[in-house]
Curated annotation (Swiss-Prot):
Native organism: Bacillus subtilis (strain 168)
Primary gene name: ylbB
Protein's name according to its UniProt entry: Uncharacterized protein YlbB
InterPro entries registered for this protein in UniProt: CBS_dom, CBS_dom_sf, Diverse_CBS-Domain
Keyword Repeat set for record: yes
Biased composition (Basic and acidic residues): 139-148
SUPFAM superfamilies named among the record's database cross-references: CBS-domain pair
SMART domains assigned: CBS (SM00116)
Keyword Repeat appears in the UniProt entry: yes
Amino acid sequence: MTKIKDLMTADLQYCTVLDNVYEAAVKMKDANVGAIPVVDEDGETLVGIVTDRDLVLRGIAIKKPNSQKITDAMTEKPVSVEEDASVDEVLHLMASHQLRRIPVTKNKKLTGIVTLGDLSLSEQTNERAGSALSDISEGDNREEGFFH
């Protein structure tokens, strides 16, 4: 059975709780991603995730300065999975929480991120990823709330 650690992106950008929203936005731009995990000061323990949507709704749209702490814009305690999680478990979490990406951890330490795109690239998971995307998109008409 395929494990998420076999499909996740392990070489990823992340922010620490010491970063600000400007630094997060630059890292997202440079990596061409729409979300970036946030780790504790130790640089390893996952504590949050910030999306481009979070930066807009919790920062720019309410006229917060670029020096705003990343912790003020991030989603704390994000849904995450351990490296040995199954594809089915991840797809279920994505569909039930309307997520397109989920941080991957090992003993609470950030080791990667898995996206619907990662799952759609695998022949074994492509069809199931499409089904999860359909479930996510059906619930995507929310007016408020912050999701990653």
